[in-house]
A protein has these predicted regions:
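Long, charge-patterned amphipathic alpha-helical coiled-coil/hairpin "stalk" segments used as oligomerization
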Residues: 144, 170-173, 187-197, 202-218
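RNA substrate-binding interface of SAM-dependent RNA methyltransferases
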Residues: 2-193, 250-255
Length: 256
């Protein structure tokens, strides 16, 4: 397939997200944990893609709201240190900046701009989120946390002046949104190190899914992967792992 064919479905991105829409009824965060709206269907469920598609699943993301009913916020280790201490938890458990870094790298990649990337997030509270490739990720962590806080309360975020949904909470499990037979690869420092481009070529699959832990350190425990690999001899941040994966697929799939 030529480079032009890869890009023919890549439409101009809508860069404005409607953060002020009052169309959706606010939902208590306690109702959200692991219990997405049963009537809310994902547009990408059982995608049958005739071309190449990379699925990135960002696991164990640190997205948790404060209990303030009037103004709930995403808890982060910079602004809520006293709260985290009262919760008797580690500051490392509240790092939404790690997820933010991952998303910035993924959505600015040529692979995403070519329409060949689909991203999902699953939080440590087991909330599953689908993000449209057209979404413009906020540049600052403050705006990003505000956006994700609204999403966790309202289940979805729409584009400004459009009915198009850019971010939405969907039902578990994640595997129902990945094409049948698609390899699902997780990354771990403890696994055998591979040269990623060679590994991708040997998969011989148009659809591939990678699981990346959206955490500051350590591995994530999942039971749905088909293989686990290490992509570097050195410890890497989650954001750099996402960048390296996208770059490898861009080389293999001839995306410039």
């Amino acid at each position: 397939m030529s480079k032009d064919e890869y890009k023919q479905n890549n439409q101009e991105k809508n860069n404005i997200i409607d953060n002020n829409s009052d169309e959706e009824e606010e939902i208590n965060y306690n109702q959200l944990k692991g219990k997405p709206d049963t009537n809310f269907k994902s547009s990408s469920k059982r995608i049958q893609d005739n071309g190449h598609k990379l699925y990135i699943i960002l696991e164990h993301a640190n997205l948790e709201l404060t209990k303030d009913k009037k103004n709930p916020e995403i808890i982060n280790s910079d602004d809520h240190r006293n709260l985290i201490k009262k919760m008797n938890k580690s500051f490392e458990d509240f790092r939404p900046d790690v997820l933010h870094h991952c998303l910035l790298n993924l959505f600015e990649s040529p692979l995403n701009k070519a329409g060949m990337l689909q991203v999902f997030i699953r939080t440590k509270e087991n909330v599953l989120i689908e993000i449209s490739p057209k979404t413009k990720i906020p540049r600052t962590i403050k705006r990003f946390c505000g956006l994700m806080g609204q999403l966790l309360q309202k289940y979805r975020i729409r584009a400004m002046n459009s009915s198009e949904v850019l971010l939405k909470v969907i039902k578990n499990p994640i595997t129902q949104y990945i094409p049948f037979g698609c390899p699902i690869i997780s990354t771990s420092e403890k696994s055998n190190t591979v040269k990623l481009e060679d590994y991708i070529y040997n998969l011989k699959s148009n659809n591939v899914a990678f699981v990346v832990g959206a955490i500051s350190k350590g591995d994530v425990n999942i039971d749905y992967m088909t293989d686990t690999i290490s992509i570097s001899s050195f410890p890497l941040t989650a954001g750099i792992v996402c960048s390296k994966i996208c770059t490898a697929f861009e080389k293999c799939w001839d995306v410039f």
